[in-house]
């Protein structure tokens, strides 16, 4: 099992909006575990946590996004404009034991 953690450092005042966008757009994604915002540490962070059986499944998920279904296209529409709401980001991949 692997855990994917995507962290976005948002522009001030945008973290809650970005978190809401992700929560709504990814509501039907079976891999989504949590959408979180910071309480301590660096300000204005949104963390998206997803879970996959292995890296191969994660890669297949990315490939599927290049040929989106109608449902995926609707999710992508909900995310329009989020790129302007954050300044940086990072992805970490963890293996569970």
In which residue ranges do the predicted regions lie?
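Short S/T/G/P-rich N-terminal loop/turn motif that feeds into the first structured element of a domain
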Residues: 1-74, 78-97
């Amino acid at each position: 099992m692997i855990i994917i953690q995507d962290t976005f450092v948002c522009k001030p005042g945008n973290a809650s909006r970005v978190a809401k966008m992700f929560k709504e757009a990814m509501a039907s994604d079976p891999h989504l575990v949590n959408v979180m915002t910071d309480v301590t540490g660096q300000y204005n962070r949104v963390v998206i946590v997803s879970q996959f059986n292995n890296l191969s499944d994660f890669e297949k998920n990315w490939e599927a996004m290049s040929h989106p279904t109608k449902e995926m296209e609707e999710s992508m529409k909900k995310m329009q404009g989020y790129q302007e709401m954050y300044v940086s980001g990072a992805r970490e991949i963890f293996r569970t034991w």
